[in-house]
C-alpha cells in the first residue's frame, strides 16, 4: 500500500447501489483507497437525458444546496486538504461530455469528521426542522 492508490469494487459498489436506489439510477463511480489517514475523494458520473452546460449545472447544484451550510459547491475540482478537520462536503470539478451526455464531478469529505456520527446528527436536525449544522463542530 505504501506510495500507492488502489481502486476497488470497480462495478456495483455498495454505495453506488445505495445512490441508485435512493437518488439517481444512472450514476457510476469507483472508490479508491490510498495511504492517507483521513479523507474520501469520489469521482461520480451521471448520464443525462439531454445536453446541458457547466453554468447550468453549477446553478442547479448551488440552488439545490443553498440551505445546506455544510455543503460547498465550487468550479474547480476539490482536494482533500480543503476539508481536512471539517464537517463540510465540497462538490466541484464539473465537466460535461457532450458526445455521451455525461456529467463528471468530484466530491470530498473528511471521513473522520463527516462520518456516521455527524451524518446522524444532520439527519436528526433535518427530521426536526433544525439548521443542518446545529450541534456539529464548526468547519475551519
Describe every region a protein language model picked out.
Residues 1-106:
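C-terminal substrate-binding/catalytic lobe of Rossmann-fold NAD(P)-dependent oxidoreductases
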Residues 81-140:
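C-terminal helical cap and adjacent loop that interface with cofactors, partners, or active-site loops
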Amino acid at each position: 500500500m505504501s506510495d500507492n492508490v488502489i481502486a476497488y469494487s470497480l462495478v456495483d459498489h455498495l454505495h453506488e447501489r445505495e445512490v441508485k436506489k435512493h437518488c439517481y439510477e444512472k450514476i457510476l463511480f469507483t472508490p479508491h483507497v490510498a495511504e492517507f489517514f483521513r479523507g474520501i475523494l469520489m469521482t461520480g458520473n451521471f448520464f443525462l437525458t439531454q445536453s446541458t452546460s457547466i453554468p447550468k449545472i453549477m446553478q442547479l447544484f448551488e440552488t439545490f444546496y443553498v440551505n445546506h451550510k455544510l455543503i460547498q459547491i465550487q468550479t474547480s475540482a476539490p482536494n482533500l486538504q480543503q476539508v481536512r478537520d471539517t464537517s463540510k462536503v465540497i462538490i466541484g470539478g464539473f465537466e460535461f461530455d457532450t458526445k455521451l451526455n455525461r456529467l463528471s464531478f468530484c466530491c470530498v469529505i473528511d471521513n473522520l469528521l463527516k462520518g456516521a456520527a455527524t451524518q446522524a446528527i444532520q439527519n436528526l436536525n433535518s427530521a426536526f426542522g433544525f439548521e443542518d449544522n446545529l450541534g456539529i463542530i464548526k468547519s475551519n
